[in-house]
Amino acid sequence: MEHYDILIIGGGAAGIAAAKAARGAKVLLADRKTKPGGVLLQCAHRGFGKDQNGPEYAAGLLADFPEGVGLALETTVLSVSKDKTAVLSGKAFGLRAVCFKQLILAAGCREIPLGALPIAGTRPKGIYTAGQMQEMMNLQGFTPEGPVVILGSGDLGLIMAKQTAEAGLSVTMVEQKTQCGGMAKNQRCLTELPIRLICGDTITQVHGHPHIEGCTTKNGEYLPCETLLIAAGLRPERELVSELGRPGWLHICGNCNTVHPMVEAVVKEGTRAGLTALENIRGDL
């Protein structure tokens, strides 16, 4: 069995920052993707750091990445045990178990899917989470069909409203609360582009088969659409360690600790987790 000082789960901004802060320790960083960077790699919009886009900001984080860090990419961590062992499944090596002294969970967050919402009707083609569509448009060159309806007006919903409207599609946003939920800089698209925002309403039914044709709101308005994007919020992804309690060797950082609106806070938490883990290892010695 392989032995590491620190196992980091997640290769986004928090995981990268943690690995850099733990420089000098024997570190393994595991991530599901083909390269580190996390969700930053699919964020074509600017607003990261000094007005960079996501890939540019990720490249800056990785510029001085420690050469000694082991990277287990295209790898899923299946389980973590209280005896400080983890089971990994990777495309390159299949199953393997590793031991660690300190564990940093930097797995980010996941979107709330349609299935978790009280929406009746069929489940046709043409329904995506906002993050799925962001990845498809920015990394795969996909262009959705319009009209587009977006459920939720948080930052990710607004970012995708702007991007789909700039692609020439008709866009309607439906927000359950009485006002828009995103940051002011992201709300600017509502005045700069022909995006309709409906507040104080929600979607209660989806229509169409095999492809979506429209949806009905709680207030009874029918909205025709070829694409429905779910931007209903984000949840920290920490189920992997939910049964461990909070032992001193476990450090949870970034968006799997709490969802942060700004990447700088994610990097700060990752750095703090890496430094704390490194101090704990040195204390054991």
Where are these regions (language model features)?
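Residues forming the flavin
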Residues: M1-L285
